[in-house]
């Protein structure tokens, strides 16, 4: 066969593994005295992929972090919200322990516990879900509940959520079935009243009904990569009972619903118990007392609430917490901008009074941690625009007056001898 693999004119080349000639395959790759065809390359890739799939479950089983380890990792990235972190750590640990033991333990079937996060805008709901998925090294996708509609109506079908998850892991069904799905703005699909309506509510109660089976566990048929381009391909079957669903929402007004229930026994008229301002529960304290009946009154259907048995409440972030968020986490906002300026060879300093001013401004806007970036971006915009065109800037200092818009950042120049010689 050696004479057939020579590169002389008129000589046919053959694959050293399967023996097919260069005319029988699409591509023949040459190596030192050997050749391999594209078909053999594909076969080798398939064999390697299968071996990786067989080995990976054992590696994951021994690497499952404990609730304490999960909580400790969340502390590195999320400031405050201690009760919510504890609830999440236990729920996530139990979920993946269940998956690693095949949904059963001593013949007892273990149910799935999806999670509902209740908390104001910018309190860290999305960040908690993202951090969990990154730490556990599982596929993660987000969906906005306000874009979802029932199948057959204009909008996004609920099964598109699973397709997005598959896209994140290159359509590997086994990986997708270990993933985490975060559905944001879940409070926006509450029905208009707590009484069943005879009219069709395709973006409220209708979406809740459509999400029921998906969250509880069903076999979702998802078109393969390419979708309608290859209609002859079989649909991918994804078991959603193995996917952890985390739903989050601000639930504005839920505190009033809880307050009505909690204060029912205070009476009216001369027998009423009058509470002073200091005795009244804050919004955060009321949300901690949320019960399924309150969520039903808010507009979630009982069946939907039943699929989200684990409820974690996040409180509104205080000014001190916002200051901590600016400087303490591993990926703190100030550290991100300092790294960005370092790429220009410039040191960036935020003075303590500047951090206080940023936090106060975010508190006034009522946007929580989410509003911090826009405030810092606004303060640094002109500097980031000019800096790449400037020479000899060693340091940029941000103080309170910069955040208030009363002055520009202080630029400290270096190399005075170079400037003097240039003159």
UniProtKB/Swiss-Prot annotation:
GO biological process terms held by the UniProt record: cell division; proteolysis involved in protein catabolic process
Source organism, top-level taxon: Bacteria
Residue span(s) of domain ClpX-type ZB: 2-56
GO molecular function terms listed in the Swiss-Prot or TrEMBL record: ATP binding; ATP hydrolysis activity; ATP-dependent protein folding chaperone; protein dimerization activity; unfolded protein binding; zinc ion binding
Protein residues bound to Zn(2+): 15, 18, 37, 40
PROSITE patterns attached to this UniProt entry: CLPX_ZB
SUPFAM superfamilies: Glucocorticoid receptor-like (DNA-binding domain), P-loop containing nucleoside triphosphate hydrolases
Gene3D superfamilies to which the protein is assigned, alphabetical: 1.10.8.60, ClpX chaperone, C4-type zinc finger domain, P-loop containing nucleotide triphosphate hydrolases
Keywords linked to the UniProt accession: ATP-binding, Chaperone, Metal-binding, Nucleotide-binding, Zinc
Binding site for ATP: 120-127
GO cellular component: HslUV protease complex
Subunit structure: Component of the ClpX-ClpP complex. Forms a hexameric ring that, in the presence of ATP, binds to fourteen ClpP subunits assembled into a disk-like structure with a central cavity, resembling the structure of eukaryotic proteasomes.
PANTHER family named in the record: ATP-DEPENDENT CLP PROTEASE ATP-BINDING SUBUNIT CLPX-LIKE, MITOCHONDRIAL (PTHR48102:SF7), ATP-DEPENDENT CLP PROTEASE ATP-BINDING SUBUNIT CLPX-LIKE, MITOCHONDRIAL-RELATED (PTHR48102)
Record's function text: ATP-dependent specificity component of the Clp protease. It directs the protease to specific substrates. Can perform chaperone functions in the absence of ClpP.
Record family assignment: Belongs to the ClpX chaperone family.
Name of protein: ATP-dependent Clp protease ATP-binding subunit ClpX
Organism in which the protein naturally occurs: Serratia proteamaculans (strain 568)
